[in-house]
Amino acid sequence: MVIFPNAKINIGLFVTEKRSDGFHNLETVFYPIDLRDILEITEMKGEKGRCVFTSTGIPIDCPPEKNLVSKAYAILATEYDLSSVDVHLHKIIPYGAGLGGGSADAAFMLVGLNQLFSLGLNEEQLMGYAARLGSDCPFFVLNHPVFAFGKGELMETIDLSLKDYHMVLVKPNRGVSTPEAYRGITPRAASFDLRELGKLPVEQWTGVVVNDFENSVIPKVPEIEEVKNILRDLGAIYVSMTGSGSAVYGLFHHLVEAEKAFPEYFVWQSE
């Protein structure tokens, strides 16, 4: 079985409250994009309970057993009699970018195992397992535009489509750790109801649909502001950092030659 975990972007991100459990409440829109990893899952018949994990592409800086893909298998293997699997991940979605690549891989692993072994898990059950792996993992089970709140695990489907826009995504070479990004945040009430995002023309998003992490992260990674300015110069009608960074996306009415503008950075463009 070969599946293709996709990335997401955040459209707007308000950090609204520090919780008593040490986490933060936030409000954001998760939007899936077609930047994808490649995940191959092969059943090892005659053997039980083992996940053999290998990877190519962007190096994964953690032991195989601590990778979220392996953890996804382990969660299901404790409750179901699973054959061992050989799993290969070709990593394309950058880390430290705010794109949810690791969470996507984990969620797609759950969905893939459910199909491979005919476990019969429904969407709600899969989202429950995904929530044990990370706050944004359940989104990748749904994988359509949502308004997310709480820690990001609570979601409401919204009506939003960017299919009429060309998207350019740029990842500076320096990444950002989520804990570091949160350290510079002062929680505040959301200044816009992101559930209404689909009613606001994209041309009016600037200054209204903002990412609170930018004020925390850009002083540490000034390249982010440089990328934003270049995207604007190329004609972007809306530019934002996604998640806690460091990737930045711009929405355009037209195709642009973004690779020439960012020869040293990771660049992805929508079709």
Regions found by a protein language model. Give the residues of each.
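Conserved, helical-rich catalytic subdomain that frames metal- and/or nucleotide-binding sites
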Residues: 51, 142-238, 253-263, 269-271
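Glycine-rich beta-strand-to-loop/alpha-helix junction loops that act as flexible
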Residues: 101-102, 241-246
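ATP-binding N-lobe of GHMP and related small-molecule kinases
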Residues: 1-97, 115, 119-124, 159-163, ...
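N-terminal pre-core extensions flanking Radical SAM catalytic domains
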Residues: 245-254
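DPxDG-like acidic metal-binding loop motif
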Residues: 97-123, 128, 139
